[in-house]
């Protein structure tokens, strides 16, 4: 699949390090949790979870995202996708728990929107290091019940998403959907295992993608060889309990490095 030229039509500053970029094209068939490959010309092509049908929400963490942050309305990138498996779509009257950390809120925003529109009940735990790094607070609040956590206590509960999760009866949720920093997700996975809820959980994984179609193996997870771009990026929690999640990942040279 060749990249399609996409012109930036709007830039929203979500936090000092996170921005949403909207484009003049829309992936109307994209499902919550799927991703697109963003070609930042002259730098790199990187995977980004769709936060809107015509938008991505990005944290400035590397060369490609730094170049993207230098762009203005009217500049363009190349987009191809959508790729991968997204979250299981909720049904009317189901109750889903969303657990989002930092920019991990990006692929969960569309899920919250869809759930609210179809008549499902939504509860969200939204975490960040500080209050100004909270992403899509109003969006999740509009979808249903919202619990906020910050590492420094500047908003909501002082602590981590697992601080709130520890006191929850997760048996009331039909599905638990998670995305955030890997260490956060590993801790959530352990908490859900203790609550016997892993089989009802789905995690949106982050790995280094090259081909995005499951051929090159750059995004494979040990020990089962799960291809995150093809088998995921959304994977059932029961598949991850004995995986490298929270311990190792592969770098751009496909070498195993510690998270």
UniProtKB/Swiss-Prot annotation:
Keyword Flavoprotein among UniProt keywords: yes
- Cite the binding residues for [2Fe-2S] cluster: 211, 216, 219, 229
Q: Which UniProt keywords apply?
A: 2Fe-2S, Electron transport, FAD, Flavoprotein, Iron, Iron-sulfur, Metal-binding, Pyrimidine biosynthesis, Transport
Membrane-spanning segments: none
Listed PROSITE patterns: 2FE2S_FER_1, FAD_FR
Q: How does it assemble?
A: Heterotetramer of 2 PyrK and 2 PyrD type B subunits.
Name of the protein in its database record? Probable dihydroorotate dehydrogenase B (NAD(+)), electron transfer subunit
